[in-house]
């Protein structure tokens, strides 16, 4: 499957304005963005087709013709963005700040709606920071691909913003991060589809701990561990009777990343051993490993996926971008006893994608084109 995108991003910072009130500073920002895209095949692409992930499998009709072989495309501007950064008064020895950022990527049945991207408050000390609110998931992190596509490297690069409580501590060139996160817009899969009920009923947030090392020579390296614990069901219908059940699916994921920033070029890479990270736009999910014959209570096992990507950029005014990503389905730790599975792309054995892009950049403006061939091998 091939995808072509023309990015007409008038990254015109529509509000690069600063306003002041006693002990407060407000900096407004934003941009108008347009995405024109053409796909040679039907694909998995949320956000009304604007967030490309991977091509769908063949779907033959009565004559054996592939129903997913047709092209599609459109033009959207709903990822245009508005935001405000607020610097507040000192609270003791801490500097206070806040951010609110929105776009128009929320959807009802027929229209786009204003959507919160980030909304948080933060307290900064000399070596530490506490952040409370919604911002980028720590697996998105400080290392992500520099490409034009809205998906920003997904399904190889985690893409997610969640409500969270985050603590960071910096010692010289090392920054430590610990986060507790809850789901809102990006949701895990389960018996009732994508829903926040699985983590809500779990009463256990997602947890992440990680470390980054940044050198004066331009290198950034780091890694982290992520835990998710879901309750897929609280009741079971078994032999025409309803039973209360105590089910839980817990999974660990691991990631490592590196980035080098030179004067006119960058190199970045990330690799994950991912389990149950479908809510971060990665391929993943879980299946059923056992069923209690008395009440239908189930145990679960996560699918494990190895996913990696690399990214190069060169230039500033005229900029070249290259990206390559690969995901491999490693199966489950325990044998599945049911064909029922919950997640995204679990019928895919492996996916490989490349992305070649060029952009022309001026102050407050960017225009670019990219070509992205992607191949998915289905089981």
Per-region residue spans from a language model:
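Bacterial Sec-dependent N-terminal signal peptides
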Residues: 1-21
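Outer membrane beta-barrel
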Residues: 21-48, 59-186, 203-204, 208-216, ...
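Outer-membrane beta-barrel proteins
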Residues: 39-43, 109-111, 141-145, 185-190, ...
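Surface-exposed loop/turn segments flanking beta-strands in extracellular/periplasmic regions
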Residues: 47-61, 289-295
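Extracellular loop and loop/strand-boundary signature of outer-membrane beta-barrel proteins
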Residues: 67-70, 105, 148-153, 188-197, ...
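Membrane-spanning beta-strands of outer-membrane beta-barrel proteins
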Residues: 77, 114, 160, 204-206, ...
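Detector for outer-membrane/organellar transmembrane beta-barrel domains
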Residues: 216-348
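Predominantly the C-terminal beta-signal and adjacent terminal strand-loop region
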Residues: 362-379
């Amino acid at each position: 499957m091939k995808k072509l995108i023309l990015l007409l991003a008038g990254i015109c910072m529509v509000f690069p304005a600063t306003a002041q009130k006693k002990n407060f500073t407000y900096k407004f920002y934003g941009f108008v963005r347009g995405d024109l895209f053409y796909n040679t095949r039907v694909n998995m692409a949320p956000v009304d087709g604007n967030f490309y992930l991977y091509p769908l499998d063949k779907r033959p009709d009565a004559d054996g013709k592939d129903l997913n072989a047709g092209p599609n495309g459109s033009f959207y501007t709903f990822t245009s963005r508005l935001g405000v950064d607020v610097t507040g008064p000192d609270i003791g020895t801490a500097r206070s700040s806040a951010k609110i950022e929105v776009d128009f990527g929320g959807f009802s049945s027929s229209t786009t709606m204003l959507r919160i991207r980030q909304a948080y408050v933060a307290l900064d000390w000399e070596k530490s920071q506490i952040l409370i609110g919604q911002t980028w998931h720590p697996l998105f992190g400080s290392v992500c691909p520099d490409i034009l596509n809205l998906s920003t490297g997904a399904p190889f690069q985690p893409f997610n913003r969640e409500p969270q409580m985050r603590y960071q501590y910096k010692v010289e060139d090392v920054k430590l991060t610990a986060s507790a996160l809850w789901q809102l817009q990006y949701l895990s899969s389960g018996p009732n589809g994508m829903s926040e009920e699985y983590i809500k009923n779990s009463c256990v947030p997602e947890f992440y701990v990680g470390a980054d090392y940044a050198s004066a020579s331009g290198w950034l390296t780091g890694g982290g561990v992520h835990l998710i614990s879901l309750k897929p069901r609280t009741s079971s219908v078994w032999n025409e009777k309803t039973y209360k059940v105590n089910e839980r699916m817990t999974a660990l994921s691991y990631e490592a990343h590196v980035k080098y920033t030179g004067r006119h070029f960058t190199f970045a890479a990330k690799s994950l051993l991912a389990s149950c990270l479908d809510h971060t736009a990665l391929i993943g999910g879980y299946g059923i490993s056992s069923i209690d014959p008395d009440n239908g209570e189930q145990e679960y096992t996560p699918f494990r996926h190895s996913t990696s990507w690399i990214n190069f950029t060169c230039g500033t005014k005229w900029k070249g971008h290259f990206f390559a990503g690969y995901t491999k389905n490693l199966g489950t730790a325990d044998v599945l006893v049911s064909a029922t599975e919950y997640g995204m792309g679990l019928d895919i054995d492996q996916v490989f994608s490349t992305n070649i892009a060029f952009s022309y950049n001026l102050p407050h403006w960017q225009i670019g084109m990219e070509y992205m061939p992607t191949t998915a091998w289905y089981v």
